[in-house]
């Protein structure tokens, strides 16, 4: 049946058929994308800018993406975590930000581990060593037949086991605790990207799903010889793991993984990729591609990271690994698999990008790979290409150990040259034109480990890689079914461009775009100019996609080594595999060639020929031999290659064996290696490194490997810098910038911090939590410091920061005096003394710097405090003070002076001891390595440096004696030892605990006593009934009746004498109470029994009754308790229960009887009210008049008339004390147990008196303690007076206060008094000398005469700070002491070598000044001097002046001081009357002025003008500081008033007010913020912009709170109160996942508030049955009716949290008085209402004038614009927000074409990226761009999209780029 007959259905079925067919075709194509709430963003400007933008649009900046600079990981908590629709909301306007260059919402990518599970039932776990069974690593005796293996043992025999090489497995984690992996595990090569931590341990489950990474790791680096399981190929390599497959795999996750620690990791092994389902086309997204590029360019210090990839397991699905962008990349080494037999495994894919192969499994019966497995086990069932890639990684590790300098391309070249076909079975083996045998199944063949290490040993780096892009014609060609399209392109290899010229090929990439109705029907081939044909794509049966290929890159390595130039032939075949619509043929739209390779032959002779040993010598110097011009016939230089030399000398080589080096005279010589400052370039040339590099791998500044002196290598950028960046320190030994500890902001060593990151404080050299002085933080709490430490950072004497009195801080330890090369620092700026290190040039010194030396090292001379290089003397000589060599003293081998104390080294026969050469070390030192070393300070003599190496002891530095015991000197001898006169501890006599000598014991051990005759210890033997006294060595009698007793207590018997009974460790003549005798012991009675025997109890304790030999509290039915007898007696036979034995004492009756007045009678005997039944008279008789009813007798009342109450069967008118009249029961009832007098059950009037347990009456009840809000007084709880919450003693003696009040000295007040602060509701006194504080230990302002520094008040500011408005402010970095913050405010310089001039610290005095030693400052010379030596002595004069004998410069020596020399009419002329000295007759030619006048430039004035002040020292008008309008001195802190635009704070003028102040425009001053504010915009508590410590900012109100109000939570990182999610009533953090309780219409479920109704509805009504009604139209979701109950707003609105109202963002053109709107400039995460601030009434008149003038100017400009617009003709319609199509795209394109530029960051093969033109930030013009289909759009910067406009912008691209 044809196509038409099958598809054309009649009628309505026609449409259904078409839809069914479309669905079937599109289903595989339209896979649902899953968008996450994570974004990748590229932002220029660093972390601060990224954080600002993230906060503005509601994102959280997780941090930089791996090693990708300027790429950040953003997370948005208020968007859906996983959605099939990309996120659209106000946060999407982040793309409009000028600094945002590119943004991409992350999409979940499916990645499959490339192992294959045959059958879980067949897996067997073994714990035995598996080496004999590891067939793929060696041929054992039981392996038959043994095929050619990978020669791994051969590499081992050559000494290579992977040592110092680091391999990381990118997978689902590795089990780092596995016994086979523990030894080689490398934490620096490991992290958990899925879990965002550093531990790569896999997630365990019942199925062991995450075993893959552990198996791969074992193949690489399982430890050898540990008797556990297997052996890794590189069993001495370091192994790490990156856990990244056990979660959502996104572009960011992959990029972070492949770029993890690239300077530490050498090889990355990955055994995963896109689905091997035969229909997927997928590869690295932009971030991962960038990470690959960065890895090969900068990883391994520029040598390039090595990426090893498994080729794929899609063989059964007819997959082709060219559709996998990871294995198809030039940056990865794609590894395939072969079975043991050499046959193709059934899972193997074919493709032209596979480089080589290793062993793995084949058929189910074939052997598989043995490796480590989860739960510390092993497996022999590892399969697939997953097993092959780690093998390759292990072999490459062996090669890198053999030659660590192999580049990433060198590794691929070595694999190409050493892999071999061997026994591998494939029908497509071919030999290319370069002589390499290659296959689509196995690449260049099976890897050979031994051959690789041998090749690596002699390898020379290949020339630089060239990239040639050959763009073919763009003519579209139609691909017909069952036919082929051929396109031929003649390539030149870019021969016209020497920087891109490719002659010898490596990788060849075809970049191709094809449209096709069924992608799986295509097959693509490429034929090289040499005739090598590569299959780039084979038919794929399951690929039904209609997408074709869009800029997809196919790669082949089959042309490796061939020439690039010539005809390249591309063939595209269309072979229909099933029926399809032939009306839509495929089209080859465009293709291009990208050729990678070198311009010269990549292999040097060293690589081509066997290595031979040759003698080398340096050839860097110029040749000095004078060669003649005749032909040279002698031997050539050893560095010439085998082609020899042609004269005239032996070094004139025809070709070099190793490298060419070009000398300064332009001649070339051959050298064995390039000299320092050069690198091995292409063509065997030595090229120069960048100027600062000592060694390098390229000529650029970011390709350094080591640096010249004075520079440090930044390991992250491979550049040489003079100063290391923040977060790193200078390693001066290795000239490196190394990273600081994670807590340091700056440091001098890894753990030696100098500045800490936020939230931590510097404790010595460590950053940790702050503790009070004398304590340190140990990670959990604050612990006391060592006794030497005043403050410390850790335990022990080495943890001191400052030392106690009598000790000095020296290099982190406390010493009693400064060591050699240290000096005592007199500054003591913090009150503690310290020893500072002398300058490196000094041996000893008395101060800092190189000018304070007091002695010098050997070979240097002391000159004016500086050590200068002396003469160079021979051994046995030294340099004397005149610089001459003199002979050392005879005992020295080398010395630094003439005496025997000046030795520096000794002869072999002598020992060096602190400058002396001695025959034996002094007694308090020991010899080690021919030097005397001091003993431990506790030893007098010793054999080593430790405290356990003493041989004798004496007194320590404090005069305390020490005693030797087992090599240690202790304060005293241990127990059982005594001290000899030689301070040695010897043992006491036997059984002696304390003694004076070996013969005299003073205390014996237990059980012994001192014999008075010989003072020895004799065993104490006590008689019967005696025991040893524990305090005295004697026998004491036991307690009476004891036969034996306890050593510790003679009263504790262990046995009793005859006639005594034992009970409770005592002996009794008769058994005590509550016991009875039984044989020789007393037995205790039962509980509550007073007397008993073995048969039972006789009587009971009070409150209990005897019943059948037992004691009971209640007797039970038929019995009552007889109080007198203490027994249970029987009731009357008629009673069920009773209170006595009588017939009328029943309380309940037997069945059939009725209770009547205490009697049980038959119903016939019931009486009338007021009468009772008389049994004797057998008739009714009247009750007593007081009874209402009675029983048995007239006076035994059972109820009473009204007004009377029943009490003990009598009626009383009032109840006695302890009872109360109950109207309900008509009887007197007992008060509660603790109550003495009451008027009701809970209406106590007086409590009982209980000695030792007082009770207090409160609101009718008795309490042992008065409740909160009351206090005890005379047995009554009285109420505290308001506003006390608790009080004591009296109503006003408060202990705590109600809300809104604070407690101060027992009184509740609204505010604390001055110099107090409220802490937890109690007023605490501020610290000493503190005027105002925010915490009891944190001062805010000091009292007069004191200054604030580090939150405390000091009498003076420490060095490096100056006093300003009672605050200590840091000086400029150049100043040691200063008077202000500027560089010209110094009073003392930081460096002692610097000089001071006009407050500036300079290296030397400037011209026109002289150095004054007394003040150590540079002073100005006289105006007439050009240079001078003092204030009145010129050394040279200004032009036109001459010097007189006194050193003064004058016009003419004949003229008087008030005259000048006239050159025109020679002679002396008088100065102007206003001048004292002058240069001419005019009044503006003065040099000095008379008294009461001041020199202003060259004019004398009475008063200085504005901007100047009178300098009385120089009698002139000097410039004020640039910030001052008027002043009293030159410094910035001597202003009287400020220039416009500056604000005055005290006497200082500032452009921006300091922290804690705000600028008041009306007064031009900096005014103090409210005490709770850190930064503010006004004086009120609601003007805060940031808060001080202990406060949190409520941004919506501008207030600082000690604790956040309801509906807010504390965000510690920003010190703010953040609003809970709109659905949360209370919460513990940001977002919808941290709720603690919910608002109405929501219920809590797992921290999330879930709506009770559908979206857009709210709940109405209580209980389980309720209704739901629609939300207000402005809300998307809500909690109630109306516009002010919203919980979620539409995309164009922002939720105002305080009133749950959805509002628009304010337009910049809206007037402040317009309707309510949100200020979205800073953030769209929360609505902050725009406020219109009222200007102060006191504003200057000039401000009002300015506003008026501005308004007039705006009106004039507005009028001009209107006139201009009218002249333009037709009015343009108002532009809608968003994008609109331009009318004529063809016309527009040319005008905007110049506005575009191509991306240089990513190749646009998978994702189309749109970029805007470059615009200035203030340019509001339309932005134009072109879409994929060529349509030109105009984009507007401001506003939101209308619903109608959105459709015009729909496109599928997931990334966007912007260049602003």
UniProtKB/Swiss-Prot annotation:
Residues 461-601 form the P/Homo B domain. A motif (Cell attachment site) lies at residues 519-521. Glycans are attached at residues 225, 381, 665, 752, 802, 852, 1014, 1191, 1290, 1497, 1685, 1707. Residues 1765-1860 are cytoplasmic. Residues 636-1727 are annotated as: CRM (Cys-rich motif). Residues 1-32 form the signal peptide. It is an enzyme of class 3 (hydrolase). GO terms for molecular function: endopeptidase activity; peptidase activity; peptide binding; serine-type endopeptidase activity. Residues 1838-1860 are annotated as: AC 2. Keywords: Cleavage on pair of basic residues, Glycoprotein, Hydrolase, Membrane, Pregnancy, Protease, Repeat, Secreted, Serine protease, Signal, Transmembrane, Transmembrane helix, Zymogen. Residues 33-114 form a propeptide. Residues 1807-1826 are annotated as: AC 1. Expressed in T-lymphocytes. Belongs to the peptidase S8 family. This is Proprotein convertase subtilisin/kexin type 5. It comes from Homo sapiens (Human). The lineage of its organism: Eukaryota, Metazoa, Chordata, Craniata, Vertebrata.
């Amino acid at each position: 049946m044809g196509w038409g007959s099958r598809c054309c259905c009649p009628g309505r079925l026609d449409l259904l058929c078409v839809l069914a067919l479309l669905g079937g075709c599109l289903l595989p194509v339209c896979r649902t994308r899953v968008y996450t709430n994570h974004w990748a963003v590229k932002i220029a400007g660093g972390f601060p800018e990224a954080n600002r933008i993230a906060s503005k649009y509601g994102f959280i900046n997780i941090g930089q993406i791996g090693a990708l600079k300027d790429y950040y990981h953003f997370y948005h908590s208020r968007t859906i975590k996983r959605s099939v629709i990309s996120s659209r909301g106000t946060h999407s306007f982040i793309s409009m930000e000028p600094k945002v260059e590119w943004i991409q919402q992350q999409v979940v990518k499916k990645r499959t581990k490339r192992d294959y599970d045959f059958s879980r039932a067949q897996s067997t776990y073994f714990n035995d060593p598996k080496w004999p069974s590891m067939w793929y690593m060696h041929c054992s005796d039981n392996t038959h037949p043994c095929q050619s293996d990978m020669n791994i043992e051969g590499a081992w025999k050559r000494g290579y086991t992977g040592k110092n090489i680091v391999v990381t497995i990118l997978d689902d984690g590795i089990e780092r605790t596995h016994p086979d992996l523990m030894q080689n595990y490398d934490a620096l090569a490991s992290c958990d990207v899925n879990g965002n931590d550093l531990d790569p341990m896999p997630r365990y489950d019942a199925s062991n799903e995450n075993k893959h990474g552990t198996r791969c790791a074992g193949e690489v680096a399982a430890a050898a010889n540990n008797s556990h399981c297997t052996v890794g190929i590189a069993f001495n390599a370091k192994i790490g793991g990156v856990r990244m497959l056990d979660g959502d795999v996104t572009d960011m996750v992959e990029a972070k993984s492949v770029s993890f620690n690239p300077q530490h990791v050498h090889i990355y092994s990955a055994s995963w990729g896109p689905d091997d389902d035969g229909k997927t086309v997928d590869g690295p997204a932009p971030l991962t591609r960038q990470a690959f590029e960065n890895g090969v360019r900068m990883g391994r210090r520029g040598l390039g990271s090595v990426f090893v990839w498994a080729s794929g397991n899609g063989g059964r699905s007819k997959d082709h690994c060219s559709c996998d962008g990871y294995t198809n990349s030039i940056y990865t080494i794609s590894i395939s698999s072969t079975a043991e037999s050499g046959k193709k495994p059934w899972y193997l894919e074919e493709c032209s990008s596979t480089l080589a192969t290793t062993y793995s499994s084949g058929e189910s019966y074939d052997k598989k790979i043995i490796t480590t497995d989860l739960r510390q086990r092993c497996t022999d069932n590892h399969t697939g290409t997953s097993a092959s890639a780690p093998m390759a990684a292990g072999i490459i590790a062996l090669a890198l150990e053999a030659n660590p300098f192999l580049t990433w391309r060198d590794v691929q070249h070595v694999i190409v040259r050493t892999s071999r076909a061997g026994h591998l079975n494939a029908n497509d083996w071919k030999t290319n034109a370069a002589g390499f045998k290659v296959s689509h199944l196995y690449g260049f063949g099976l890897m050979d480990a031994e051959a690789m290490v041998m090749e690596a040993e002699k390898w020379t780096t290949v020339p630089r890689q060239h990239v040639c892009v050959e763009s073919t014609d763009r003519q579209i060609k139609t691909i017909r079914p069952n036919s082929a399209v051929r396109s031929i392109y003649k390539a030149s290899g870019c021969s016209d461009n020497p920087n891109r010229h490719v002659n010898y090929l490596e990788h060849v990439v075809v970049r191709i775009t094809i449209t096709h109705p069924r992608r799986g029907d295509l097959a693509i081939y490429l034929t090289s100019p040499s005739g090598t044909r590569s299959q780039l794509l084979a038919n794929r049966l399951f690929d039904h996609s209609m997408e074709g290929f869009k800029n997809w890159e196919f790669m082949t390595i089959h042309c490796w080594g061939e020439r690039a130039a010539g005809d390249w032939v591309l063939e595209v075949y269309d072979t229909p595999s099933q029926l399809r619509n032939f009306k839509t043929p495929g089209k080859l739209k465009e293709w291009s060639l990208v050729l990678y390779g070198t311009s010269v032959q990549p292999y040097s002779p060293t690589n081509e020929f066997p290595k031979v040993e040759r003698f080398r010598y340096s050839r860097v110097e110029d040749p000095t031999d004078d060669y003649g011009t005749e032909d040279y016939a002698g031997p050539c230089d050893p560095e010439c290659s085998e082609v020899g030399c042609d004269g005239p000398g032996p070094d004139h080589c025809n070709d070099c064996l190793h490298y060419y080096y070009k000398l300064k005279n332009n001649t070339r010589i051959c050298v064995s290696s390039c000299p320092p400052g050069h690198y091995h370039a292409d063509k065997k040339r030595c090229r120069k490194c960048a100027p600062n590099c000592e060694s390098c791998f390229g000529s650029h500044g970011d390709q350094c490997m080591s640096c010249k002196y004075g520079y440090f290598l930044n390991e992250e950028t491979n550049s040489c810098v003079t100063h290391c960046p923040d977060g790193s320190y200078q390693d001066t030994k290795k000239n490196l910038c190394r990273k600081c500890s994670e807590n340091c902001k700056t440091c001098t060593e890894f753990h030696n911090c100098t500045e800490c990151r936020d939230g931590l404080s510097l404790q010595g050299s460590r950053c940790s939590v702050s503790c009070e002085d004398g304590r340190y933080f140990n990670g959990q709490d604050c612990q006391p410091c060592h006794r030497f430490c005043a403050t410390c950072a850790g335990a022990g004497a080495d943890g001191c920061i400052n030392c106690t009195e009598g000790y000095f801080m020296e290099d982190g330890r406390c010493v009693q005096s400064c060591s050699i090369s240290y000096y005592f620092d007199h500054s003591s700026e913090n009150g503690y003394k310290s020893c500072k290190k002398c300058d490196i040039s000094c041996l000893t010194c008395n101060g800092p710097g190189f000018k304070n030396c007091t002695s010098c090292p050997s070979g240097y001379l002391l000159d004016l405090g500086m050590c200068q290089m002396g003469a160079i003397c021979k051994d046995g000589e030294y340099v004397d003070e005149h610089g001459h060599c003199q002979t050392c003293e005879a005992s020295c081998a080398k010395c630094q002076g003439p005496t025997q104390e000046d030795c520096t080294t000794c002869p072999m026969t002598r020992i060096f001891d602190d400058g002396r050469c001695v025959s034996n070390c002094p007694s308090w030192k020991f010899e080690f390595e021919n030097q005397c070393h001091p003993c431990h300070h506790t030893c007098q003599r010793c054999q080593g440096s430790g405290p356990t190496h003493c041989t004798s002891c004496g007194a320590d530095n404090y005069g305390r004696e020490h005693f030797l015991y087992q090599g240690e000197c202790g304060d005293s001898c241990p127990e059982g030892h005594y001290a000899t006169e030689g301070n040695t501890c010897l043992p006491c006599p036997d059984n002696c605990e304390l003694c004076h000598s070996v013969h005299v014991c003073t205390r014996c051990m237990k059980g012994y006593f001192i014999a008075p005759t010989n003072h020895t210890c004799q065993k104490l033997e006590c008689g019967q009934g005696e025991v040893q006294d524990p305090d005295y060595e004697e026998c004491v009698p036991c307690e009476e009746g004891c036969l034996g007793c306890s050593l510790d207590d003679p009263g504790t018997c262990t046995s009793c004498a005859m006639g005594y009974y034992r009970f409770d460790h005592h002996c009794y003549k008769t058994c005590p109470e509550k016991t009875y005798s039984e044989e020789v012991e007393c037995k205790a009675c039962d509980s509550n029994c007073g007397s008993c025997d073995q048969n039972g109890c006789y009587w009971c304790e009070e409150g209990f009754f005897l019943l059948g030999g037992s004691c009971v509290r209640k007797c039970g039915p038929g019995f009552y308790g007889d109080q007198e007898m203490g027994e249970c007696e029987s009731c009357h036979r008629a009673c069920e229960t009773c209170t006595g034995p009588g017939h009328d004492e029943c309380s309940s009756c037997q069945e059939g009887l009725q209770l009547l007045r205490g009697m049980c009678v038959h119903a016939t005997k019931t009486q009338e009210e007021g009468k009772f039944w008389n049994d004797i008279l057998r008739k009714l008789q009247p009750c007593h008049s007081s009874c209402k009813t009675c029983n048995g007798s007239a006076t035994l009342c059972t109820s009473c008339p009204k007004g009377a109450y029943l009490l003990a069967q009598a009626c009383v008118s009032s109840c006695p004390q302890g009872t109360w009249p109950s109207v309900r029961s008509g009887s007197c009832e007992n008060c509660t147990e603790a109550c003495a007098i009451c008027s009701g059950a809970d209406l106590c009037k007086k409590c009982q008196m209980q000695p030792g347990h007082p009770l207090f009456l409160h609101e009718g009840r008795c309490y042992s303690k008065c409740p909160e809000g009351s206090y005890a007084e005379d047995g009554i709880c009285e109420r505290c007076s308001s506003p006390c919450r608790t009080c004591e003693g009296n109503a006003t003696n408060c202990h705590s206060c109600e809300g809104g009040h604070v407690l101060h000295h027992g009184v509740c007040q609204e505010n604390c008094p001055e110099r107090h602060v409220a802490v937890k509701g109690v007023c605490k006194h501020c610290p000493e000398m503190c005027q105002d504080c925010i915490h009891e230990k944190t001062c805010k302002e000091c009292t007069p005469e004191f200054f604030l520094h580090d939150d405390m008040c000091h009498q003076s500011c420490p060095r490096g700070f100056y006093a300003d408005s009672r605050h200590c402010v840091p000086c400029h970095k150049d100043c040691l002491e200063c008077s202000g913050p500027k560089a010209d405010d110094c009073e003392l310089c930081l460096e002692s070598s610097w000089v001071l001039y006009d407050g500036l610290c300079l290296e030397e005095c400037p011209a026109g000044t002289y150095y004054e030693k007394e003040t150590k400052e540079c002073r100005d010379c006289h105006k007439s001097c050009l240079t001078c030596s003092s204030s009145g002595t010129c050394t040279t004069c200004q032009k036109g002046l001459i010097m007189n004998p006194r050193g003064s410069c004058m016009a003419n020596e004949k003229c008087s001081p008030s005259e000048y020399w006239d050159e025109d009419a020679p002679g002396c002329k008088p100065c102007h009357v206003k001048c004292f000295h002058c240069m001419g007759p005019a009044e503006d030619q003065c040099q000095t002025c008379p008294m009461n006048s001041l020199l202003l430039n060259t004019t004398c004035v009475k008063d200085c003008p504005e901007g100047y002040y009178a300098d009385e020292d120089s009698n002139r008008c000097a410039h004020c500081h640039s910030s001052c309008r008027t002043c009293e001195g030159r410094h910035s802190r001597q202003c009287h008033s400020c220039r416009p635009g500056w604000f005055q704070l005290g006497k200082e003028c500032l452009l921006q007010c300091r922290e804690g102040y705000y600028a008041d425009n009306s007064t031009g001053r900096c005014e103090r913020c409210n005490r709770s504010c850190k930064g503010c915009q006004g004086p009120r508590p609601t003007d805060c912009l940031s808060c001080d410590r202990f406060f949190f900012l409520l941004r919506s109100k501008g207030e600082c709170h000690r604790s956040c109000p309801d509906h807010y939570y504390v965000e510690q990182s920003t010190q703010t109160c953040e609003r809970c999610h709109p659905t949360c009533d209370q919460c513990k953090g940001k977002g919808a996942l941290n709720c603690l309780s919910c608002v109405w219409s929501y219920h809590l479920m797992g921290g999330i508030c879930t709506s009770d109704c559908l979206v857009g509805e709210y709940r109405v009504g209580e209980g389980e049955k309720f209704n739901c009604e629609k939300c207000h139209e402005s809300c998307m979701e809500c909690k109630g009716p109306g516009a002010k109950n919203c919980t979620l707003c539409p995309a164009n609105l922002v939720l105002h949290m305080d009133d749950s109202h959805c509002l628009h963002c304010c337009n910049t053109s809206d007037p402040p008085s317009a309707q309510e709107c949100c200020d979205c400039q800073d953030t769209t995460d929360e609505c902050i209402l725009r406020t219109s601030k009222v200007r102060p009434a006191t504003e200057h008149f000039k401000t009002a004038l300015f506003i008026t003038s501005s308004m007039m100017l705006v009106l004039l400009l507005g009028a001009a614009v209107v006139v201009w617009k009218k002249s333009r003709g037709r009015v343009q319609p108002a532009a809608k927000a968003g994008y609109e199509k331009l009318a004529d795209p063809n016309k527009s394109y040319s005008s905007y074409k110049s506005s575009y530029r191509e991306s240089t960051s990513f190749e646009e093969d998978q994702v189309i990226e749109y970029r805007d033109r470059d615009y200035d930030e203030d340019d509001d013009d339309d932005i134009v761009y072109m879409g994929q289909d060529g349509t030109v759009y105009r984009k507007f910067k401001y506003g939101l999209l209308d619903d109608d406009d959105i459709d015009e912008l729909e496109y599928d691209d997931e990334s966007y780029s912007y260049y602003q």
